């Protein structure tokens, strides 16, 4: 089976790929820490800069499954670009032979308190559902706890530990209305 891993792939390791996708041809987009290993059928490359490049990848590999790791898996992660990248991947999934799409996201989608972040997460999940309804994609949404890593540079705790290591001080900002 040909599998594409895209989105917030900084948490994906070679060991994870071997365990989760044995005997599959796997392409990981956007993770600089994973190296291509042809004998294991693992291909790693940067996320395409243009839609034409992304289209070429989908036409060349004809993925049977796509796993999209949301930026919302990272505590206090980067939110910009999530909807656009998700839309691009879904567009090519609907055009190709792809049969399964798994959207792995953080826990915010189940919260009832409307905040900017919960609204964005719920909208991303709705986009997945709409593509499933409109184009017959087989979409699953998996909500998981936040992911943490001591090596992924965009990770919340990695940044805290690096700051601590460099300045020997930790600073946690509180909301102004919070009382001591």
PLM regions and their residue ranges:
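Conserved Rossmann-fold NAD(P)-dependent oxidoreductase catalytic core, especially the SDR/UDP-sugar
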Residues: 84-120, 140
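A generic structural motif
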Residues: 21-27, 137
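NAD(P)-dependent short-chain dehydrogenase/reductase
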Residues: 118, 122, 126-179
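Structural signature of the Rossmann-like NAD(P)-dependent dehydrogenase/reductase core
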Residues: 5, 68, 100-103, 140-146, ...
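N-terminal Rossmann-fold cofactor-binding loop
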Residues: 29-33
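N-terminal Rossmann NAD(P)H-binding glycine-rich loop of SDR-like oxidoreductase domains
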Residues: 2-23
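NAD(P)H-binding glycine-rich loop region in Rossmannoid oxidoreductase-like domains
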Residues: 47-88, 111-112
